[in-house]
Swiss-Prot record:
One of its GO terms (molecular function) is chromatin binding. Associates with the MRE11-RAD50-NBN (MRN) damage-sensing complex; this association is constitutive. Interacts with MRE11. Interacts with NBN. Interacts with RAD50. The gene is MRNIP. Signal peptide: none annotated. The keyword DNA repair applies. Plays a role in the cellular response to DNA damage and the maintenance of genome stability through its association with the MRN damage-sensing complex. Promotes chromatin loading and activity of the MRN complex to facilitate subsequent ATM-mediated DNA damage response signaling and DNA repair. It is found in: Nucleus; Nucleus, Nucleoplasm. This is MRN complex-interacting protein. A motif (Nuclear localization signal (NLS)) lies at residues 148-151. Belongs to the MRNIP family. Pfam families: MRNIP (PF15749). Keywords: DNA damage, DNA repair, Nucleus, Phosphoprotein. GO terms for biological process: DNA damage response; DNA repair; mitotic G2 DNA damage checkpoint signaling; positive regulation of double-strand break repair via homologous recombination; positive regulation of protein kinase activity; protein localization to chromatin; regulation of double-strand break repair via nonhomologous end joining; response to ionizing radiation. Residues 223-259 are annotated as: Necessary for the association with the MRN complex.
């Protein structure tokens, strides 16, 4: 039988792996792992192929373990060196942090405990005890300051109220003096509900005696005709003196002779000033009684001195400025100055009252009667 071929164990110079190759005459061989060609330098074992392969496995395992151990040792040495180099710096940095952290935690613990105690006790009795003592100490100055504040309030109120009190006293004195004295005619007209009763004694002091006698005669009739007086009060404005009321009362003096003349004089004023009734209805009401006045009274003429107030107050001041024909007709048709009969005078008055209408100026209304 032929002898088995011998093999040798070789190691690559590049990858440092153990391999089994057959023995040859040439000294060159190629690595099975990396494929590099190299020459024979050293044989790590010789034998059969099977024995060489087992030996190669053992060598590779040992080499791997050694390489791992070397790597571990290198890593450990590097880590040890790093720890030796960085250790003191890290220890110096870590020591203050470790010292600060427990201090912070300790303070937080105390604060948390205090907050819990405050929440349970409702504001903390121990904390409130100190400010309570502090507030109790300044109590006496506050107590002494209270009367000072009251005195100051009184001092401030007294000078303010002083002039008012004096004014009120003066007002009381003036009221008492005014009660003793007769009232002014304007005051009496504003304060009295009936102008006819309260104005007479006030005006009697200022007017001549002849006029006061006539007014005294009309005072009793003014009480009887309360409705007519109320109508005249409505005609008089509140802020002005009662001049129109006086004129109406002077007109009411002729009631002794004409009977219903006051009713005739007061009626034509109400529709003109109030504007409630139409002018035609007023004309119809004026025409009937004024046509009867000459039959009932039987008067022909009246003196111009007594009828002068009628002409002054019957036409309103507004229509005079607006109606241009009123003053001309009042001057031309004035029956009391020329001596025309009473019927013509009443017709002229009705024509004057109709021409005062702003919307019907320039027309002749004599044919309607």
């Amino acid at each position: 039988m032929a002898p088995p071929q011998q093999a040798r164990v070789l190691r690559c110079c590049c990858c440092s792996l153990f391999q089994a190759h057959q023995v040859k005459k040439s000294l060159k061989w190629t690595c099975k792992a990396c494929g590099k060609k190299q020459s024979f330098l050293q044989a790590y074992g010789e034998g059969s192929g099977a024995d060489c392969r087992r030996h190669v496995q053992k060598l590779n395992l040992l080499q791997g373990q050694i390489s791992e151990m070397s790597l571990r040792s290198l890593g450990e040495s590097i880590s040890a060196n790093e720890e030796e180099n960085v250790g003191p710096w890290q220890a110096a940095r870590a020591s203050p942090q470790e010292t600060l952290q427990p201090s912070k935690n300790r303070w937080l613990k105390y604060l948390e405990r205090d907050s819990k105690e405050l929440g349970l006790k409702g504001g903390g009795v121990c904390f409130n005890s100190q400010p309570s003592s502090e507030t109790e100490k300044p109590d006496p100055p506050f107590s002494t300051g209270l009367p000072r504040k009251r005195k100051w309030n009184q001092s401030t109120v007294q000078p303010l109220c002083g002039p008012h009190v004096q004014d009120s006293r003066n007002c009381e004195v003036t009221l008492k003096s005014l009660k003793a004295r007769p009232l002014h005619p304007t005051w009496g007209a504003r304060s009295s509900p009936d102008c006819s009763t309260w104005d007479l004694p006030c005006i009697s002091e200022e007017l001549p005696p002849s006029f006061t006698q006539d007014r005294a005669g009309l005072a009793g009739k003014g009480r009887e005709s309360s409705r007519e007086d109320l109508d005249t009060m409505e005609l008089v404005p509140r802020g002005e003196p009662p001049c129109p009321a006086q004129q109406v009362r002077t007109m009411s003096k002729w009631e002794q002779c004409l009977g219903n003349s006051s009713h005739l004089d007061t009626e034509p004023l109400t529709p003109l000033q109030r504007g409630l009734r139409p002018i035609q209805a007023a004309q119809a009401e004026q025409g009937a009684p004024r046509a009867q006045t000459p039959r009932e009274g039987g008067l022909c003429r009246l003196p111009g001195a007594r009828q002068s107030p009628q002409t002054t107050h019957t036409p309103m001041p507004g229509p005079k400025w607006l109606c241009g024909r009123i003053p001309e007709q009042s001057q031309g048709t004035g029956p009391w100055a020329e001596g025309v009969p009473l019927v013509k005078g009443m017709q002229a008055r009705s024509s004057l009252m109709r021409l005062c209408d702003l919307f019907k100026t320039g027309e002749d209304f004599d044919d309607d009667l």
